[in-house]
């Protein structure tokens, strides 16, 4: 039987997406801080505008943040914030 006749399986990484997003945000935050920028203002500017010029190339931060969709970044930030506010 030819290998083209067999069903292939694709396996996703077992690492949750949130971990990657958190790592990206923390790396970007550190890079901004090291360059002397206000990290919160710069990240908000990027999230609102989509302009990668708000993020420096230092520590490959610009490349990292562009690998994640802005809506996914916002979703992760909102989830983290709301989970921290709950007193259940």
UniProtKB/Swiss-Prot annotation:
It comes from the Bacteria. Transmembrane segments: none annotated. Belongs to the UPF0297 family. This is UPF0297 protein GWCH70_2489. The lineage of its organism: Bacteria, Bacillati, Bacillota, Bacilli, Bacillales.
């Amino acid at each position: 039987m030819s290998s083209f006749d067999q069903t292939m399986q694709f396996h996703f990484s077992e690492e949750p997406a949130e971990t990657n997003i958190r790592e990206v945000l923390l790396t970007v935050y550190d890079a901004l801080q090291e360059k002397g920028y206000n990290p919160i203002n710069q990240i908000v500017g990027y999230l609102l505008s989509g302009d990668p010029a708000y993020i420096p190339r230092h520590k490959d931060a610009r490349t990292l943040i562009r690998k994640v969709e802005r809506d996914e970044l916002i979703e992760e930030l909102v989830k983290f914030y709301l989970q921290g506010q709950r007193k259940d």
